[in-house]
Each structure stands twice: as C-alpha cells, then as structure tokens.
Amino acid sequence: MYLETIHEPADIRGYTAEQRRALAREMRDALIRRTSCIGGHIGPNLGIIEATIALHTVFDSPRDKIVFDVSHQCYPHKMLTGRAHAYIDEAQYSDVSGFTNTDESTHDIFNIGHTSTAISLASGLAKARDLAGGSENIVALIGDGSMSGGEALEGLNTVGELGTNFIIVFNDNDQSISENHGGMYRKFRELRETGGTAPDNLFRAMGLSYRYVADGNDTEALIAAFSEVKDTTKPVVVHIVTHKGKGLSFAEDDPEGWHRHAPFHIESGIAKKATVPDPYAAATVDFVLETARKNPNFVYLSAGIVGGINLSPADRTALGRQYVDVGIAEEHAVAMASGLARGGARPIFGTYSSFFQRTYDQMAQDVCVNRSPAVFLATGTSLYRSTDVTHLGFYDISIFSNIPNLVYLAPTSVEEHIAVLRWAVEQTEHPVMIRMPFSGCTENPYPVRTDYGDLNKSIVVREGADVLLIGVGNFAVLASEAADELARKGIRATVVNPLYLSGLDTALLNSLAKNHSLILTLEDGIVEGGFGQKVSSFYGEKGGVRVMNYGLPKQFFNRYKPDELARTYHLTAPQIAADVLREMR
C-alpha cells in the first residue's frame, strides 16, 4: 500500500505517473470504505483526488499555502499530509474531522466549513507574504457551487489587481449540493463546451490570467498546468473540470444525493440504517407545496441547498417558478425575500441556522428596518445537530432575537410549527423568523392557536407553585421532563413555553412572580444574549425572585458528543431537578 508509507507530501514527489495512478485508485478505495462505515462528504472528495495529488506534487505545502473553500473536500489532502491512518485503519476513522483543522496539521491553514471564503482568506495570506518579502505560492481551491457566493466575487475583485503570485484552482463539477443556478454557471458551461475559449470569461474580466484543464481527473494534465503557474508573478485561475463522485457509480448517477451520505453497503449503495424521516421537515415540505398550490404569489427560496427541509428534485419541479435557488448566496436571499415581500409576494427563505449567521446585516437593514413581512426558517437549531465547530446551530437566538421588528418564534411540536408557519405567511405586518424544532412534543400539550399576531404571549403548559420552568423551543420537552422529576419529589412546578424569542410576556411574568421564588430558563442555545438573560434582566429590576439560566456558554465547541455536552452543563431532567432541590433546601 502506498498510503501506509506517506507521512508528508514530499513522499509522493518522486512518484512516476503509474505510481500516481495507483495511489489515486488506493485513495479512492480508502475513501469509499471509510465513508461506507462512518459517512461523510463522499461525492466532492471522490472528484478531487487527482487534483489533490497534483497539488501536493507541484507545490511545497505547508510552505506553499493551499486554502480549501468549505474544506469538505479535504479528505484526500489529509491522506497526503500525515493523516492517512484515519482513512485506512477502521479503528482510527474518527481521529480527524471532516474539514480542515489547524489543530490537526500545519498543512491546514484555516478552520473552514462555510462556502465562498477561500479567495478572501488566501488574498490576505498573499498580501501578508508580500509585506514580509516572502516568495511562497498561495493557492485557493474553490468549487462545488461556492463561486456564486458574494464573498467569492468580492475576493475575485480584489485579487484581480494584486499584481502578485496568487493561484485560484476552480474545481468545476457543475454542482453545488444540488444543481447550480444562475447566469454565471451558464457562462461556465460555455467555457467547458469551448475548451475554455468562450469570449465571456468572468475571470479574465476580473483581471486574472486563465488556464483551462478539460479533464480535472487527469493527474498528469493537472501537474502540467500547476507547474506552468507555479511561482507566477500575477493572479491566475486554473479552471479544472472534475467529475463529482468519480469511481462510485451511485455517486456519479446521483451527485446531489451522494454529496454527503450516511454509512452504506458498498455493493448496493443502500444505507446501513434506515433513514428516520424528520417529521418537521416532512410537514414543512407538505406545507410549502400546499401553500404554493393555493397562493400563486408564494415563493420558496433556497441558497444552494434545500434548506434542511429536503425538498426533492420532484418537489422543486412541482414548485416551478415558485421555487428560487439563488446559489450559495444567503445574504442575497434575505434581501431578495425582503423585496419579494415588499412587492406583495409571500416568501419563505429556509436554511441552516449556521448559514443564517452570514445574513445579520441584511436581516437588520434590508428586512427589519423596512418592516418587510418576509418569513425565514432556521433549521438545524440544536446542540444535538451538527457538532463540527464550523456548523454549530445554537447561536441564532442570541444573534436574531435582538434585532428590532423581527418576530422570532420557537414552536415545540409539528402542529404548532405548521400553525406558526401558516400565520407567518398569511400575515403582512411583521418580518418573522421561525426556529424549526429539532425535537419536540409528540402531541401538543395545549390547544394550538392559529393567530400569533398578539405578540409575546407565552403558554402555561402546567400550573404549579414555587418553581417555574421556562422551556424554550427544543427544550420545552426538557422543562416538562424536569417537572415530572420534581413531581416525584413532591414539588409541583409550573411549566411555561414562551414561544416568542424576541420579546417577553411581561404580564405573565409579573403574575408568576407572586407565587414563584425560583425560576429556571432552559434553552438549546448559548446563555449570553439569549432568551434566559432577557428573563433575568426583567426580574433583576424587581427583585424577590431567583433566576437560573440553563444553556451553553459563549464558546466554540468542536466534534463533541451531544449527550456529554448536555450533561456537562446540566441540561438533563435529573440534573435540573437535583439543582432545584438543592436550591430549595
């Protein structure tokens, strides 16, 4: 095996063409075996193996710096930079993350997980090199739809006039997660169809030199192209056309479905565990399709992905012009939603909580200053969802619940989630953001209302005395479970579902203060700036009530085990009940 002998990129630089082909086959087999066991971003990585071998053959990493956009396609890079053990030894499969990680290797220049950032990051490295009088090559590898992001275009605009060594490898596999959209990608297709000679060339228009490689899975052609641009004295783009999912028939036939995949049987491609449908996503898809049929002015927006609700290709086709994929451009999607709402349409833009972070300014300025009644659906909002530091979904409450004019709601059941969605789309007074539950009540413990226009009205789920548990969104169930624990100890706790994250039910809080001396807030997010601190601030001005805020501290967590993290911060029902008993002694 070649991989067992590779400890750094220098180990492959003396390889012959045949050895490189054998190495690529070995890497591809290792990737397929590993992903079949633990899952991961298999499609992008299978398509970039030859380019990674060529990059590490030509360039001298880590002296020459290679920045991976998104970095979900870094598995082959990790194989060649001292981490092959994590791809060939099943016992060590989990030793490395799925993204570049500066804690793992000096060959990983940044911790990256969001799209369209590599050109900007690398441009800073290039400028710093020039200021220091360095001579290393700076390479930004970008693809998988990331070129449609505004930051990528802003970066192109800057590097076009750097006048110094800067190499962009554009990995063109004609895919984002789903299909690419937009005029830019039509022009990229023209470049592919003309062997890179089409007159409309974005990169040349931005002031960069341009080199085209028709077969981006031909290692020798790539080595020739990279050798040609190595040590260049001006910015250059090497446009390589790759085959996403190369070498695995299932991934080649269904690049969207195999962008990222759960563990699977290699022979059949069937997942090893049956996928458990997300009831919230399924109900949301049904709602979107139903609303589109009834309301010709309804539009669902996505940004290069289907927003965590799993709109199938057939669903997207059925929506027709009522579905708009803006590419990986969340900021644009939010502003477009504002324009749609101002123009009389009824838009929903849905994406993951982690990606909504990119849209703060548009949400504040373009939407909320203008009071545009657009609807935004945040998914993946839980410490129990993605555990990689680049994709955490529990900062959104602190970020968005404090924007004036934005009504942010956290429903707690499928029935309530759809009721809130329906109200949000039908009303035309407020910008509304909805935190789609990750988990929640199987059956709603109280009657679900249909009108949420009387803002900030919380729901008393059960009545008690002395102890009040306020469970936010996903943690509404946790509040009820903690109340059950306390009931077994003879304490009847009151449980409240606030529903609204952007404001307080001050009348209810004042009323509850009369017969409750201990109040606990539980939220699936960070405490600082969160809902619980709003409650603490409210009672802090009055005195006489002790408030304890439960949630996560303001820090980044990486590759954690959710249950362990929850226990660390006492986010389990037995721990919460024990804390209450201790406080009441």
Predicted region positions:
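A short, small-residue-rich loop immediately preceding and capping a beta-strand
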Residues: 38-40, 64-67, 111, 132-149, ...
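A glycine-rich helix N-cap at a beta->alpha junction
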Residues: 86-96, 161-173, 368-380
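N-terminal amphipathic, basic-rich helices that act as targeting or association modules
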Residues: 1-79, 215
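Peripheral docking tails and interdomain loops at the edges
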Residues: 263-267, 271-274, 385-387, 407, ...
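Cofactor-binding active-site loop characterized by glycine-rich and histidine/acidic residues
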Residues: 41-162, 298, 312-313, 453
